[in-house]
UniProtKB/Swiss-Prot annotation:
Species the sequence originates in: Chlamydia trachomatis serovar L2 (strain ATCC VR-902B / DSM 19102 / 434/Bu)
Function, in words: Involved in DNA repair and RecF pathway recombination.
Gene Ontology cellular component terms for the protein in this record: bacterial nucleoid
Top-level taxonomy: Bacteria, Pseudomonadati, Chlamydiota, Chlamydiia, Chlamydiales
Extent of the signal sequence: none
Gene name, Swiss-Prot/TrEMBL: recO
Protein name (Swiss-Prot/TrEMBL): DNA repair protein RecO
Claim: Isomerase is one of the keywords in the record: no
Length: 243
């Protein structure tokens, strides 16, 4: 059976001879596929297999064999990202976040749309690392792992006017904070909430025009979430909710 789907190549790994195995993120989720002679100059869709490339793929499915890329029509090579180290580094951060949180074959149309739009908009930003950290926050929200209440998870003390401590998906007051929690001032937590609640990309792009020193804390918060999860990129979705 053949299917046609849009997708962004996240990784491209060499196989024997000049074959490659690509990991593609699409509305259908994270997929791995084999491309015969994909690294060869004679492959007419070789460029569609490069990492950070958006293409329309024709894929052959013959279980239990690995999917096979039959054709790829390059739609957007994201040349601007690939020609700038800061942009490339920031895009790579988003890619790693997807690889570390998403299960194979779990449909994620909303997350794919979010990721694709972040890739399109990141060249417009003055602070791409901050912009990619915004994606990590949106991803935490998508996974249902970002507490937006205003009270301590343990004692329910109001955090309206005090330093807020976050770890994984929980909020803590100063009394229940531990050495691994990440502290956010009221102003920093307000910015975090503005990012999460933003409904338009232009709002995020505008926010990323300011040198707001919060990206390191967001990245640390995301890492705390990963510390309690398995390695989803090595597992397969079996048609049931796993997260």
């Amino acid at each position: 059976m053949q299917i046609t789907l849009p997708g962004v190549v996240l990784t491209n790994s060499p196989a024997e001879k000049q074959h490659v195995i690509v990991k593609i993120f699409s509305p259908a989720g994270l997929l791995s596929a084999f491309a015969k002679n994909g690294a060869s100059l004679s492959c007419d869709f070789r460029e569609s297999l490069f990492p950070i490339s958006f293409s329309l793929f024709t894929i052959q499915q013959s279980p239990p064999k690995m999917r096979k890329v039959i054709q790829g029509e390059l739609q957007n090579p994201f040349t601007t990202i690939k020609s700038s180290y800061p942009l490339l580094q920031s895009a790579g951060k988003m890619i790693q976040a997807i690889l570390k949180t998403q299960w194979h074959e779990k449909p994620s149309p909303h997350l794919f749309s979010l990721f694709f739009n972040f890739l399109q908009r990141i060249p417009e930003t003055q602070y791409p690392n901050f912009f990619s950290s915004m994606f990590l926050l949106k991803l935490l929200q998508h996974e249902g792992s970002l507490d937006l209440s205003r009270s301590c998870t343990l004692c329910k003390t109001s955090l309206e006017s005090s330093t807020i401590y976050r770890y994984e998906g929980a909020l803590f007051c100063e009394k229940h904070a531990h050495e691994e929690t990440i502290s956010f001032s009221q102003e920093e937590d307000h910015i975090l909430r503005v990012i999460v609640q933003a409904k338009k990309f232009q709002e995020l792009v505008c926010l990323a025009e300011f040198p707001i020193d919060i990206d390191t804390k967001i990245d640390a918060l995301f890492s705390s979430f990963l510390s309690e999860t398995s390695e989803p990129s090595s597992l397969y979705y079996k048609g049931k909710t796993l997260l």
